[in-house]
Each structure stands twice: as C-alpha cells, then as structure tokens.
Regions:
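Histidine/acidic residue-rich metal-binding segments in metalloenzymes
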Residues: 24, 59-73, 79-81, 98-104, ...
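An N-terminally biased module of ancient metal coordination in phosphate/nucleic-acid-related enzymes
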Residues: 1-86, 90, 94, 99-102, ...
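Surface-exposed cleft-lining segments at the edges of enzyme active sites
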Residues: 121-134, 162-173
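Active-site rim beta-loop-alpha module in soluble metabolic enzymes
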Residues: 157-166, 192
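Non-cysteine beta-strand/loop elements that form the S-adenosyl-L-methionine
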Residues: 33-40, 105-115, 153-160, 196
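Short, surface-exposed amphipathic charged segments that create phosphate/polyanion-binding patches used
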Residues: 98-99, 122-124, 271-273
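Charged catalytic cores and adjacent phosphate/nucleic-acid-binding surfaces used
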Residues: 1-10, 20, 31, 116, ...
Length: 273
C-alpha cells in the first residue's frame, strides 16, 4: 500500500477551488498517513483563455501560516507537509533558488507547464505541427530547463504533454523519444533528483500515469531510486486517485519502495502489498 499523496492543489492554486480541509479529510478517508500540499507557483505564466497573466502566484506567508495551523490540527490523524509545485522556465533559475532558500518547504516539485511560452493544455500549442513534433519539443524544453534550474526535488509529470495531443498516446512511446528521455533521466539521477509518478494521467484517459511505466522502468535501469507519487488532485474526490493501480505499476517497474520528502530530504517507504 502507498500511504502518501505528495501532489495536491487547494484554493491557493488558481485552478482549484478546494479547501485545504476538504483535501485533508479526503486523505484521511482514503487511508493516507501523510500528504504534501503542493500548490502551483508558476512565475511569469502568460495570459490564457482561462486565466490572466500571473495568475499562478500566491502569498507564501499566508500559505505557510495556514498550513502550519493545519499541521497541528491534523497531527493525530495525518501528517501534513508543506510543499510547492514550481513551473520551470529557463530564465527563472535564480528566482526559484532564492525562493526555495527563503521558505522551509518539505518538498518542491519542478514541472514543465510551458513550452516556449505556450501551455499544451490549449490546442494552439499543437497548431501547425504533429503530435510527434510537439512531444519532442516538450522533451527538448525539459532538458533546457533542467540545465538551468536545480531548486527542486522531483520532476513532475514528465510526458505531461501527451495528455493533450490530438491522438494522445498514439504518437508516443519511450522508444520513439529514447534519446531525449534518457538525457532527462540521466540528469535527474546524476543530480540526485526524483521522478514523480503522477496518477492524473489515469483520469485523463491515457491508461497510464505520467510518465509512462516504460519511462519509470528505464529510470530504474539507469540507476534511479527516488520515485515520488502523487494524484495531482485539484478536487477532494481525486486525492490518492487510483492508488491501488499505482502500487501495481511501481512494483511492476521493479521498485519495492517509493520516496516521500520531509525537509527536502527523501524518506523511503517500502511498498506493502
């Protein structure tokens, strides 16, 4: 059993209306022993059809104050950790370095939500190119980000772009992008970074988490050991989403343990059948 959901969003994220209480109560009801709140902090996020420019920023002092209160309130039934999901862009390396040194996060997820200033969530990103071209560009941009930014603990939802392609996984396999993906995985391993298994891919109809199990398996083959797990829930009903399947996938990739982060340090938990 996996007993920690290390990726979830609350009202502090522009794209979630969920109260922190609702997410924590859902975690307790799902049998979680720990959670990490990881609200979106995407500096320099552009205007989109749904959000104004700069929408994915929030008051970190208020965030820490509120979550610290809830750590105490829930301490007898759930360990509450304070994290953040930062949106990687190559020019933000120094900004995120200063931010993560200033605030005592337990866990920092680094995620690529923008590809040369465009969010693949919107169809405009795919106009004039094939899914294959778009996916390859996303991996190349991820490599560029990793070379510029070191202030995170685990890479969030690698292959996220596949969720939004016109044909989703039809144009995607590890083998097709092995050169780019291997460069990403080798960088993570050599820099002591984790790889997130993000279960949101299951609810987006992909039939697999992000990244694909073949990528997780390759991470292990290359010597990777730090796999974090999160549902990427923005609503309480998605907390610990499809976690039984998560256990089966991770063990099928050769892992007998997963990682949680406390104080920016990995803690390894054995996967209990």
């Amino acid at each position: 059993m996996i007993t920690c959901d290390a990726h979830m969003h609350t009202r502090f994220s522009e794209d979630s209306d969920a109260s922190v209480h609702s997410m924590l109560d859902a975690a307790v009801n799902k049998g979680m022993q720990a959670v990490c709140i990881t609200d979106h902090l995407d500096k320099d996020f552009p205007e989109t059809p749904d959000f104004p420019a700069g929408a994915f920023m929030f008051d970190l002092d208020e965030y820490f104050s509120r979550l610290t209160q809830l750590k105490t309130e829930y301490q007898k039934k759930l360990e509450v950790r304070i994290g953040v999901e930062i949106g990687l862009q190559p020019h933000l390396g120094e900004y995120y370095k200063e931010l993560t040194e200033k605030y005592p996060f337990d866990f920092v997820i680094g995620s690529v939500h923008l590809i040369h200033g465009q969010d693949p969530y919107y169809r405009g990103f795919f106009e004039g190119r094939s899914d294959e071209e778009a996916y390859r560009e996303a991996f190349q941009v991820t490599i560029e980000n990793l070379k510029k930014i070191d202030s995170f603990d685990s890479l969030g939802h690698l292959d996220y772009v596949v969720r939004y392609g016109a044909h989703q996984a039809e144009a995607y396999s590890y083998r097709k992008y092995a050169e780019e993906i291997d460069e990403i995985l080798k960088h993570l391993i050599s820099h002591g970074k984790g790889l997130e298994m993000n279960m949101a891919g299951m609810k987006y109809g992909l039939g697999f988490p992000n990244p694909h199990p073949d990528v997780i398996r390759r991470y292990k083959e290359l010597g990777g050991e730090i796999v974090t797990i999160g549902a990427d829930a923005h609503r309480s009903e998605h907390v610990a989403f499809d976690y039984e399947q998560a256990r089966e996938i991770l063990t099928g990739c050769g892992f007998s343990y997963y990682a949680e982060f406390k104080g920016r340090k990995p803690v390894f938990r054995r996967i209990v059948p």
